[in-house]
Amino acid sequence: SRYVLLEFGPMDDYDYLRNGVYDLLSEGYFPIIAHVERYQCLADHVERIKDLTGMGAYIQVNAGSVMGNVGFGMKSFTRKLLKQELVHFVATDAHDTKKRAPELKKCADYIVHKYGNQYAEDIFVNNPEHVIRNEIL
């Protein structure tokens, strides 16, 4: 697939992040920026998320952030992005079945209730299927 999951350091500056996205787009890849809520240069900067998506990047947030498991700030920011339909994927950030178990159900149920069934289906089912099939979102 031409989709690439990008992870940056939490303290990387915006220009570095934007240039990384630009470089991948220039080579014909579709960058998916992992857990945007963790990057200090993006936190509470919805306009920067809009800039990146306008360039062609896709946005992924963690289910735990949406549900407030990692603090109010990340919860608030991810929900702002969801409200504006700037999120393309929700993931677990699971590394194992104990410490960070893969739990999506509560988050999926919340998104269906708050933002609608179609948007939830897109970010949990349709968009991931497009990635696997190497199809344009």
Each language-model region and where it sits:
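Extended substrate/RNA-proximal surfaces in nucleic-acid metabolism proteins
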Residues: 1-58
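Active-site beta-loop-alpha junctions enriched in small/polar residues
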Residues: 9-11, 36-39, 62-68, 94-97
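Charged helix-capping and loop-helix junction motifs
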Residues: 18-21, 44-50, 72-82, 106-107
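Structural motif
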Residues: 27, 84-85
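A short helix-to-beta-strand connector/capping loop
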Residues: 55, 85-86, 116-119
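Short active-site-adjacent structural elements
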Residues: 67-71, 97-102, 132
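Short acidic/histidine-rich active-site segments
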Residues: 86-102
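Mid-to-C-terminal alpha-helical segments outside catalytic/metal-binding sites
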Residues: 104, 108-137
